[in-house]
Design a protein with these regions (language model features):
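Conserved ABC ATPase "signature" region
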Residues: 3-6, 88, 100-117
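The feature captures the beta-strand-to-loop junction immediately N-terminal to the Walker
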Residues: 36-38
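Conserved catalytic segment of ABC-fold P-loop ATPases
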Residues: 189-196
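Conserved ABC ATPase "signature" C-loop
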Residues: 199-200, 215
Length: 222
């Protein structure tokens, strides 16, 4: 549960503006929630707080289970380590043993399409390669909660479609997904619920179709 999660950004010398304010919602096991809104609505800040990358200035987050997040290009990767080493590093962070990660290694590498560069430091990867490997690691290491930001837009259309399919498979296993995207087609195809943010506040929560409709109406009105 997210209770009044807030994050502040400095505005001027002494004034503060809240990036998020008065947000509260429950996420149940197996929910696939699309979080939508215009640029600057607070979507990425919310995901950072839920992923525990950033702490809320006020309020609390209560969660159960392992959380894997893909928030930005290179999230969770050490640039000097190879792709292989980073896969094992991320598995360790999620509380997995080396043996558990090893059983997933081939599947992760094949999905990401980085076989030739597996033992190359990731600082030499292109942004597209980083995103492919980052998503593959997050999705295949079986977290209870998967959080994915708009970073998938860096990949090509074919890979984005592949990711939507994989997230759908993950969700069928009873896992929870929080997904931010400006691609309403992807949100509609994947999610069963939606949350609409506007100026750091939750202005609507409901079925994914109703949430998208509200978002479109708000865009037309402005």
């Amino acid at each position: 549960k997210v209770g009044e999660s807030n994050d502040r950004t400095i505005k001027g010398d002494s004034e503060y503006s809240w990036a998020l304010q008065d947000i509260s919602f429950d996420v149940k096991q197996g929910d696939i929630i699309g979080i939508i809104g215009k640029n600057g609505a607070g979507k990425s800040t919310l995901l950072k707080i839920l992923s525990k990358v950033t702490g809320p200035s006020k309020g609390t987050i209560k969660s159960k289970g392992r959380i894997a997040a893909l928030l930005e290009v290179g999230t969770g990767f050490h640039p000097e380590l190879t792709g292989r080493e980073n896969i094992f590093l991320n598995g360790t962070i999620l509380g997995m043993t080396k043996k558990e990660v090893a059983t997933k290694l081939d599947e992760i590498v094949e999905f990401a399409g980085v076989e030739r560069y597996l033992d190359t430091p990731v600082k030499r990867y292109s942004s597209g390669m980083m995103v492919r490997l980052g998503f593959s690691v997050a999705a295949h290491l079986e977290p209870e909660i998967l959080i994915v930001d708009e970073v998938l837009a860096v990949g090509d259309a074919e890979f984005q479609k592949k990711c939507i399919g994989k997230m759908s498979d993950v969700a069928k296993g009873g896992r929870t997904i929080l997904f931010v995207s400006h691609n309403m087609g992807s949100v509609k195809a994947l999610c069963n619920k939606g949350i609409l943010l506007e100026n750091g506040r939750k202005v609507f929560e409901g079925s994914v179709n109703d949430t998208i409709a509200k978002y479109v109406i708000n865009k037309v009105d402005t």
